């Protein structure tokens, strides 16, 4: 999925319109995540009706107010609006955490052709490897709500990076707590071995008295 957008500029739907325009930024944002491509237009009444449902769906999966950890999910708006002004107006109806392609980028139309978008609204759900999980998840989102994400998660076989990071941190913390104890333990054992070796050498010297084959 990352390859699909390398070399492109993705814009955050926040007040500052921050851009993700480097390979590193794109990879960090998209890698190992399910991607929802929302093809829509503010000119479409159906899209306007669907937007609040989509916004609520995405917020409940990614906003810390609702969840302890944000889901490994990205929403990318692919505008099929008739003008940049119309796109800007419709973006106000979408989550602030979503991304979008700049209006002047013709890649919007290319993606529409690539995924055979003929009617709106359309939500194409992609696995991290760019394969299609759902060609149009609009009805799923409307009927199942956030439960459909669990189905996508299983189908995508995501690696839970948050869990892995926590696991590594816990192991590292445990190692740091026990390392000094182990070092003391091994130091004491080494001293005991050295003392025993010195005692054995002293015993050999005391009982030596010419016991060699040529003594």
From Swiss-Prot:
GO terms for cellular component: photoreceptor outer segment. Belongs to the nucleoredoxin family. GO terms for biological process: photoreceptor cell maintenance. This is Nucleoredoxin-like protein 1. Plays an important role in retinal cone photoreceptor survival. May play a role in cone cell viability, slowing down cone degeneration, does not seem to play a role in degenerating rods. PANTHER family: NUCLEOREDOXIN-LIKE PROTEIN 1. Its main location: other. The keyword DNA repair does not apply. Residues 1-164 form the Thioredoxin domain. Keywords: Cell projection. It comes from the Eukaryota. Residues 190-215 are annotated as: Disordered. It is found in: Cell projection, Cilium, Photoreceptor outer segment.
């Amino acid at each position: 999925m990352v390859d699909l957008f390398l070399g492109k500029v993705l814009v955050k739907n926040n007040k500052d319109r921050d851009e993700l325009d480097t390979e590193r930024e794109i990879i960090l944002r998209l890698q190992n995540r399910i991607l929802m491509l929302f093809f829509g237009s503010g000119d479409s009444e159906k899209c306007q009706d669907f937007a609040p449902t989509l916004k609520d769906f995405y917020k409940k999966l990614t906003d810390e107010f609702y969840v302890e950890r944000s889901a490994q999910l990205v929403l990318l708006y692919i505008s099929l609006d008739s003008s940049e002004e119309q796109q800007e107006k419709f973006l106000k109806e979408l989550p602030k955490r979503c991304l979008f392609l700049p209006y002047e980028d013709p890649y919007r139309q290319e993606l529409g052709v690539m995924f055979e978008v003929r009617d709106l609204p359309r939500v194409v759900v992609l696995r991290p490897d760019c394969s299609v999980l759902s060609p149009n998840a609009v009805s799923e989102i409307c009927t199942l709500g956030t439960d459909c994400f669990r189905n996508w998660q299983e189908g995508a076989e995501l690696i839970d990076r948050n869990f892995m990071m926590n696991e590594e941190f816990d192991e590292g913390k445990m190692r740091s707590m026990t390392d000094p104890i182990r070092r003391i333990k091994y130091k004491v054992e080494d001293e005991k071995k050295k003392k025993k070796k010195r005692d054995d050498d002293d015993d050999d010297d005391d009982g030596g008295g010419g016991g060699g084959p040529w003594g």
